């Protein structure tokens, strides 16, 4: 390998490492990389850093897989799994390399073309993005060039590639699928969040491997956001002018600039995906003014302008997050809540933070609204509107429920949890969070109701999701907090003109321009209005969660839950033993064969009857929770349940779907479509043609079906007159022939509106298709085997079989004749 005593050229070092990737196993390659990082100076490591990043995380275009961290699991390859985690650990060799290069202020280019669509379109049209992460980093293309790049330091470059790794196509080992939480990538995300978002103490400073001292923070070009901007008394212009002196003036701020950078990168890469309309709506006047001031720092470069209405016309992105993507974002949300809730009690009050709070404590106070609130809301809106109506939506649901329950991530509890009721009581101190995140509780909840109305609630997984959402929102005090937040938002304004709100809406600034001006209305009301308008715009149409329209949605959902409960209960009451017995009896011809039946299987068959009973319980509890949230009248709810019960036939079977008669015939209503989709009702579809021409069934021999059909056709054609004469006789022989040679069922014309059963005389004919059934063949085989055991020859067995069939035919004829007077 390479020796530290020598000083090979960077190209030779890079070439040697590339050669080792082909010839050496993974463990030895990582050990060699650790020695190289420890032994060689930053000048020589600078040349191999981009190659090493690409080797670990893969290329941005996906042509190089890298270490496939998302597909690396302990159960598949434990040696590589633990080696990769140790190498990429926050205190591991890779981070030592990052800090060593950062100390020398090396820069690395990251193509703008791989950034999320809104940011990419903004930069390509020379519009400065709002996020400070991109300020002073944009490299404009040379004359004639079209590609933009970001000049990043080693830490930023590493985090950009690490975050972008989540957006690439996942590569699983052939035929193997494991939980996302067990992958090396997911575990590393968890490690980085725990390391850079410490609950106790400060962020561990990076240590230089050569001198033992700490690595200095970046020069004034650093992307770190000035912490004075978090205060409510800092103006926009001061924010950027004072930034150049902050890095060296405030040692405490140097400790957490990596935390800021990590959060900004994760949020920008994972959540910054939305439509052009949403992007333009987010460009508030304050954001445009901020971008205008930032032009001062890039005055030597080609002009870059703030976003204007109608700009970014070329932006178009179709983004569909994966379930793994959502699970990782949920992990980020949980860590941010834990980090924010770890603030010292004396720093919770905004009146004291500006004088006594450290930068880390100040970051904890504002990390959720400043970094993630807006983009997570848009991300959730996108998922609620575009995610398929299947069970995979559970990941999105849990991410949403994690965000709206920050009280679940409080480390210190005043007393241990003694029961469910104590867990379900939301402390009053969280009312501020509910008010400042009102749309997460109201609009997203109503969108979830709309999704639930379009799903199959009999499905156990869908029923569980409705139960989970209802249980969370029925927690004690939470509905009252949401109602109070709505009342604050709807509180009439008597002094502030409507158009002045836009100065208070920018989520990046927190309304700092007008912080010294005390409006006549309450601060709480102002915060709620600012939150809603910042996310939805001035022209938003707000639907009250406890208004009449939302209440109608809940009543519709309650009715559908009652219908689904009825269906689940009828399925759970259907004993598997009775089905088995019926199938067993049908082998002996004692069952009722259904030639017109269709396949009734569904996910419920695979789930099992215990799961179906659990589904019934989930729906029952969900209905109770909705009653608690919206205070539904028990009488009204009982009437809904009674209507559902009355819609069932006495024999437990569903009626026809709801239809209306139109000029074009029968048309399904929306309720009828829902009934069919959810299996609540169905049309009685019967085969009206020649039974001999039905499709070959799985229990029939295809060759015999075809042969017997040709044989019966020849017999019916040749002896048609004879069979007709026999059926015309008035004696018992005529009755016998009519019963077995003519169709016993009449063709029926059915519709949801009318039922007409015209009789159509059928010509006498014989049917031999029953002989092609495997069941019949098995009976014949068993019969002849028993005959041979009783020393009966084939001729005698055949004669006895014919005698038995004749006796059976006579008995059937006699029974049918006895039933005719009763039927008439």
UniProtKB/Swiss-Prot annotation:
Keywords: Cell membrane, Endoplasmic reticulum, Golgi apparatus, Hydrolase, Lipid metabolism, Magnesium, Membrane, Metal-binding, Nucleus, Transmembrane, Transmembrane helix. One of its GO terms (biological process) is ceramide biosynthetic process. It is found in: Endoplasmic reticulum membrane; Golgi apparatus membrane; Nucleus envelope; Cell membrane, Sarcolemma. The chain crosses the membrane at residues 777-797. It catalyses: a sphingomyelin + H2O = phosphocholine + an N-acylsphing-4-enine + H(+). It is an enzyme of class 3 (hydrolase). The keyword Membrane applies. It is a single-pass membrane protein. Its EC number is 3.1.4.12. Its main location: endoplasmic reticulum. Its cofactor is Mg(2+). One of its GO terms (molecular function) is metal ion binding. GO terms for cellular component: endoplasmic reticulum; endoplasmic reticulum membrane; Golgi membrane; nuclear envelope; sarcolemma. It comes from the Eukaryota. Catalyzes the hydrolysis of membrane sphingomyelin to form phosphorylcholine and ceramide. It has a relevant role in the homeostasis of membrane sphingolipids, thereby influencing membrane integrity, and endoplasmic reticulum organization and function. May sensitize cells to DNA damage-induced apoptosis. This is Sphingomyelin phosphodiesterase 4. It comes from Xenopus laevis. The gene is smpd4.
